[in-house]
């Protein structure tokens, strides 16, 4: 098997495209790596020029040419023959390649004449040299065009691979973009939910702050009201103490004044007693005086007792002023009851006929006076009981209203001033 034909000197007439991109790593590259490596072949008249529209057979592998003799003959193409093209295996030398062609061309004709004049052998040798040069140039052009085609094919393959890789990247990026869009939608929905929740929390916080402010204001008012209640309670306690002391003082003064009036009324009758006809024993008068003194001492001790009870009640109990006033009224009523004794005695005195039978002189008059005083005190106690019941029913009323003092004891002796009779005592 024959090897590839020998190549002539390589002329680098074009720049390497890979070198221009910066990717050419071949040491024996058939293209120029710079303008300095470009070499132009010498111009020759018989050089083969490539015509546009014709098939370029310079590129390709030599194995096809070597084994071409064993391949079947190509069929004739009527279209190509009509255009004036002939197949390679049936190709004959044209008028340009034949000797007659030189005679038809004026330039060749002059050269031929000149060559014929000199030497016929020299003309044949020069013609053979020119043909060999043309063949070498054709081979070089074929080799250079084949290398360029290979380079272009490699570049095309690389571009296709790059395009496929870019398409794969594009699909991956589209998938990633879809995933990111879904994530953005989810995040936007979460953000909307969080915004709604934040608005609700803000509204709830606003309501809670307003409620807290209202509660703080109400608590401050409650504390102020408590302080005012304490101050009013202390003031009411002082007023109750003053009222109780005034009542006790007034009762003591009235009883003392009644005793003095009794003594003053009895003193002008001492002279008239001498004229009385009914004798009285001194022991009975002494008993009456003793009884008056005991009553006076009883009133004094009762006032002291009232004061001690009030102080004890203030110390032991921390109730309201209404309960204190009720307690004081109850004490007054019990003391008055103990002073007068049982109500049975008063009823007996009311039903007894002694009131009309006894004379209005001496001890009988004093007994009637005591009876009237007892009746008046009983009426007064009934009014006190009514007040107690009203206070029990009206506990919710204002405690700042002062208690009404008990009615002043009227002088029981004024109604009997005109009934006194003068009696001559022998």
Curated annotation (Swiss-Prot):
**Which residue stretches does the UniProt record annotate as biased composition, category Basic and acidic residues?**
54-70, 78-101, 108-120, 135-155, 284-317
Skewed-composition ranges (Acidic residues): 416-426
Q: Which organism is it from?
A: Oryza sativa subsp. japonica (Rice)
Keyword annotations:
Coiled coil, DNA-binding, Metal-binding, Zinc, Zinc-finger
Q: What does the record list as coiled-coil region(s)? A: 144-245
Instruction: Look up keyword Zinc and say if it applies.
Output: yes
- Region Disordered: list its residue ranges: 34-155, 253-317, 390-426
List the biased-composition ranges (Polar residues).
255-272
Which portions of the chain have biased composition (kind: Low complexity)? 124-133
The keyword DNA-binding is assigned to this record: yes
Q: Which GO terms describe its molecular function?
A: DNA binding; zinc ion binding
Instruction: Spell out the protein name for this chain.
Output: Zinc finger CCCH domain-containing protein 13
Residues in C3H1-type zinc fingers: 10-36
Q: Which InterPro entries match?
A: Znf_C3H13/40, Znf_CCCH, Znf_CCCH_sf
């Amino acid at each position: 098997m024959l090897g590839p034909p020998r190549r002539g000197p390589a002329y680098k007439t074009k720049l390497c495209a890979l070198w221009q991109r910066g990717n050419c790593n071949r040491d024996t590259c058939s293209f120029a790596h710079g303008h300095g490596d470009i070499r132009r072949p010498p111009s020759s008249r018989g050089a083969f020029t490539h015509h546009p529209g014709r098939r370029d057979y310079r590129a390709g592998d030599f194995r096809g040419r070597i084994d071409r003799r064993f391949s079947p003959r190509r069929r004739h193409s009527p279209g190509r023959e009509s255009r004036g093209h002939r197949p390679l295996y049936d190709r004959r030398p044209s008028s340009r390649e034949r000797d007659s062609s030189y005679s038809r061309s004026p330039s060749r004709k002059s050269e031929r004449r000149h060559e014929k004049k000199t030497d016929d052998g020299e003309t044949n040798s020069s013609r053979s040299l020119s043909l060999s040069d043309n063949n070498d140039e054709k081979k070089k052009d074929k080799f250079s065009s084949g290398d360029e085609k290979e380079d272009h094919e490699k570049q095309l393959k690389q571009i296709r691979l790059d395009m496929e890789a870019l398409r794969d990247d594009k699909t991956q990026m589209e998938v990633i973009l879809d995933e990111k869009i879904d994530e953005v939608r989810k995040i936007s929905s979460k953000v909307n939910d969080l915004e709604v929740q934040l608005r609700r929390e803000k509204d709830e916080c606003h309501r809670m702050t307003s409620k807290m402010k209202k509660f703080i204001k109400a608590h401050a008012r409650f504390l102020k009201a408590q302080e005012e209640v304490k101050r009013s309670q202390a003031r009411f306690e002082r007023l109750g103490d003053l009222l109780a002391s005034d009542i006790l003082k007034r009762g003591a003064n009235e009883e003392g004044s009644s005793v003095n009036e009794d003594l003053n009324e009895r003193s002008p009758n001492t002279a008239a007693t001498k004229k009385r006809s009914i004798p009285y024993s001194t022991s009975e008068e002494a008993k009456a005086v003793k009884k008056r003194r005991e009553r006076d001492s009883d009133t004094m001790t009762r006032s002291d007792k009232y004061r001690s009870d009030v102080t004890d009640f203030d110390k032991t109990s921390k109730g309201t002023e209404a309960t204190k006033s009720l307690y004081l009224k109850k004490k007054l009523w019990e003391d008055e009851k103990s002073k007068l004794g049982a109500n049975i005695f008063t009823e007996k005195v009311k039903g007894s006929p002694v009131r009309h039978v006894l004379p209005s002189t001496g001890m009988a008059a004093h007994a009637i006076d005591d009876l009237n005083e007892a009746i008046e005190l009983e009426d007064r106690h009934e009014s006190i009981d009514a007040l107690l019941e009203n206070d029990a029913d009206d506990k919710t009323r204002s405690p700042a209203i002062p208690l009404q003092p008990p009615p002043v004891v009227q002088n029981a002796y004024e109604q009997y001033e005109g009934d006194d009779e003068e009696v001559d005592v022998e």
